């Protein structure tokens, strides 16, 4: 396992609440939303605009727009001591000075991504079955995500392996940090924790909340109580 450079390694090890948000272009409140969510206890914040209401209305984010949104998130993350993640794009992660690059199964090969972003940023990987989990445990990624636990509109058409995969990963007792992902909200969180997860990724549980800070705080309190 690669040893992450300080202070990113300790920050990742202590993280339990990971938020994926779109750029909120149709609302125009990204800065206020991000600050509220981070104040509520979010440890990592990732920009993922694919399939968002903003994308449907305005079209895909251009690189310059994505960097502008990431600058907003970076400022909020620095104020709150959180990590900033970029989805898929190693070049954007490098340009934004992101702490984390998250790769899906069909994204850049890991060695290529590492050459682009350099030694400092963390790299995460999505996993959806036992074989992918085994690969993520063995390869030089710093963390991995396990799911979807439930079908989710952010990944339309993807079969959800469910909590069975979460239980399997928990039984492996790997030292590498991992996060359960996919359809997790406050009501479902106890099931996820009972399955053995201690870290989660959420989207709508916070992005759709009337009070993002309070929603994040309730999730974080439930996580740290285990």
Swiss-Prot record:
It comes from Mycobacterium sp. (strain JLS). The gene is thiE. Coiled coil: none annotated. Mg(2+) binds at residues 88, 107. Its cofactor is Mg(2+). Pathway: Cofactor biosynthesis; thiamine diphosphate biosynthesis; thiamine phosphate from 4-amino-2-methyl-5-diphosphomethylpyrimidine and 4-methyl-5-(2-phosphoethyl)-thiazole: step 1/1. SUPFAM superfamilies: Thiamin phosphate synthase. This is Thiamine-phosphate synthase. 2-[(2R,5Z)-2-carboxy-4-methylthiazol-5(2H)-ylidene]ethyl phosphate binds at residues 152-154, 183. The keyword Magnesium applies. It holds the Pfam family TMP-TENI. The keyword Transferase applies.
């Amino acid at each position: 396992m690669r040893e992450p450079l300080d202070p990113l390694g300790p920050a990742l090890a202590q993280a339990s609440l990971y938020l994926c948000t779109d750029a909120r272009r149709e609302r125009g409140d990204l800065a206020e939303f991000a600050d509220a969510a981070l104040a509520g206890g979010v440890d990592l914040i990732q920009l993922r605009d694919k399939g968002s209401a903003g994308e449907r209305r305005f079209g895909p984010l251009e690189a310059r727009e994505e960097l502008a949104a990431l600058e907003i998130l970076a400022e909020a993350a620095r104020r709150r001591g959180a990590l900033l993640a970029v989805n898929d794009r190693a070049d954007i992660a490098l340009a934004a000075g992101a702490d984390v690059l998250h790769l899906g199964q069909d994204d850049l090969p890991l060695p290529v991504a590492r050459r682009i972003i350099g030694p400092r940023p963390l790299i995460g990987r999505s996993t959806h079955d036992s074989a992918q989990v085994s690969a993520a445990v063995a390869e030089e990624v710093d963390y991995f995500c396990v799911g979807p636990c439930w079908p989710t509109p952010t990944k339309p058409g993807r079969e959800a392996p469910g909590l069975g995969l979460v239980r399997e990963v928990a039984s492996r007792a790997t030292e590498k940090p991992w996060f359960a992902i996919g359809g997790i909200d406050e009501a479902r969180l106890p099931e996820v924790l009972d399955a053995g997860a201690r870290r989660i990724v959420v989207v709508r549980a916070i992005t759709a909340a009337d009070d993002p800070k309070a929603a994040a705080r309730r999730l974080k309190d439930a996580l740290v109580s285990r």
